[in-house]
């Protein structure tokens, strides 16, 4: 049985879906005002891998990941670029789709956009106002945190803890909010900004309400899994829970999953430190599969440390797996141990999707394959396990002239003409073909 570390309970929980054989997942997507950075990619890749493992286990997955296309940063960026907000966000949605495709990420079942759910957002806020979970003040609408009895349980905090922390804060909204912790559901329009008509005047939604509306509209009042980066635990996911459960009276999500950060040379990635790395730029020099494989080297909840060496190691290891995949089939080989590797891999992934341990099993399997156990059945299974990590290798086909050289070398060796055999081997090496003589015949890999 798959076990998931649930942030809400701070413990491993058996995964029991709402509907047998089906999984509903909602993962917070990007705010589309710039190219995604490697930290954003960690979340995308982690939850794509989790989705793929569910599908490998036979589940039908309804995977929803949104685009936040109404936001202060988008308004600011569009104004600086001299573009309207939709054209500006469209540009970075397209860039996002290109980047994640290069990382081998499967398309989501649906990528909802905030601008397509404005009526539903307004209706959601109206219900909260009617139930007195929210109040209007000067054209803004705020959620009344004091009515949410388990507010911030997800972040393992109490309302009292948060109120103490907020007591020294002063902001422009402080005078009109009942409580410093109350958060905006609807923001009144400012001059020159994009806005929509509402019962409280022209305005636009707050960030947190957007995900609650899209998740419940598409997946229903209660969903199986809600995921995102660890930075979203508070306040974003905390506020999603408060407003969603206030509206429906039901548990919003049964499992909360949060992925760890990406550090750069053991430092937090930030623009101020100058170590901010976008996937768009990284793809100019590093293959997308290498980036993805690097991100999978740690279990999704743990931080990943980005270094040039770590990426290089991922490239070398991926090349080894590719060369293993392209070994010649030996149908008469003994493959009885195959099920042991599959069982070990599933054990690793069932334990809260431990990709690090899963990859260890894959390398043990590759070593076993290289020792002469590569049947068609083994190759098919090897490919299935790699695909869970988004790794798909193409069959390597040698040019006819290279195949001819390999055959000529075999003839030279058979005739004990080792000088000719060595010359052909060196010639092939210059073309990137490395030969390995084994008791079962010659093998080749592309260097």
Swiss-Prot record:
Cofactor(s) the protein requires to work: Zn(2+)
Reaction catalysis annotation: tRNA(Cys) + L-cysteine + ATP = L-cysteinyl-tRNA(Cys) + AMP + diphosphate
Keywords, in A-Z order: Aminoacyl-tRNA synthetase, ATP-binding, Cytoplasm, Ligase, Metal-binding, Nucleotide-binding, Protein biosynthesis, Zinc
Binding residues for Zn(2+): 28, 211, 236, 240
Full protein name: Cysteine--tRNA ligase
Subunit field text: Monomer.
Enzyme class: ligase
Pfam short name (any one): DALR_2
GO-annotated molecular function: ATP binding; cysteine-tRNA ligase activity; zinc ion binding
């Amino acid at each position: 049985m798959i076990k998931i570390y649930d942030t809400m309970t701070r413990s491993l929980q058996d995964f029991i879906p709402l509907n047998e054989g089906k999984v509903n997942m909602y993962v917070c997507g990007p705010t589309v005002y710039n190219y995604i950075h490697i930290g954003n990619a960690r979340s995308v890749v982690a939850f794509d891998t989790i989705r793929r493992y569910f599908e490998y286990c036979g589940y039908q997955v309804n995977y929803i990941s949104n685009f936040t296309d109404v936001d202060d940063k988008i308004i600011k960026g569009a104004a600086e670029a001299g573009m309207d907000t939709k054209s500006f966000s469209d540009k970075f949605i397209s860039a996002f789709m290109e980047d994640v495709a290069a990382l081998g990420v499967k398309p989501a079942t649906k990528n909802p956009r905030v601008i397509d759910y404005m009526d539903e957002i307004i209706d959601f806020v109206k219900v909260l106002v009617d139930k007195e979970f929210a109040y209007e003040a000067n054209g803004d609408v705020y959620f009344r945190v004091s009515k949410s009895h388990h507010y911030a349980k997800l972040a393992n905090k109490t309302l009292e803890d948060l109120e103490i922390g907020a007591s020294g804060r002063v902001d422009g909204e402080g005078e009109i909010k009942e409580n410093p912790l109350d958060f905006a559901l609807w923001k009144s329009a400012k001059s020159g900004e994009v806005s929509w008509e509402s019962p409280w005047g022209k305005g636009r939604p707050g960030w947190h309400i957007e995900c609650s509306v899209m998740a419940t509209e598409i997946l229903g009042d209660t969903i199986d899994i809600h995921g995102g980066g660890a930075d979203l635990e508070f306040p974003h996911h905390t506020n999603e829970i408060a407003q969603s459960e206030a509206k429906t009276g039901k548990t919003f999500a049964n499992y909360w999953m949060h992925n760890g950060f990406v550090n750069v040379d053991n430092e937090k990635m930030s623009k101020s430190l100058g170590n901010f790395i976008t996937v768009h730029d990284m793809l100019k020099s590093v293959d997308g599969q290498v980036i993805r494989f690097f991100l999978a080297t740690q279990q999704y909840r743990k931080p990943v440390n980005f270094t040039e060496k770590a990426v290089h190691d991922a490239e070398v290891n991926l090349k080894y797996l590719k060369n293993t995949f392209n070994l010649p089939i030996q149908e008469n080989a003994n493959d009885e141990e195959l099920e042991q590797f599959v069982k070990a891999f599933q054990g690793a992934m069932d334990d809260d999707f431990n990709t690090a341990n899963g990859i260890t099993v894959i390398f043990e399997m590759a070593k076993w394959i290289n020792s002469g156990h590569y049947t068609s059945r083994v190759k098919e299974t090897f490919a299935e396990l790699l695909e869970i990590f988004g790794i798909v290798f193409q069959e390597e086909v040698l040019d006819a002239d290279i195949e001819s050289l390999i055959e000529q070398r075999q003839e030279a060796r058979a005739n004990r003409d080792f000088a000719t055999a060595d010359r052909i081997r060196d010639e092939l090496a210059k073309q990137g073909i490395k030969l390995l003589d084994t008791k079962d015949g010659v093998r080749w890999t592309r260097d």
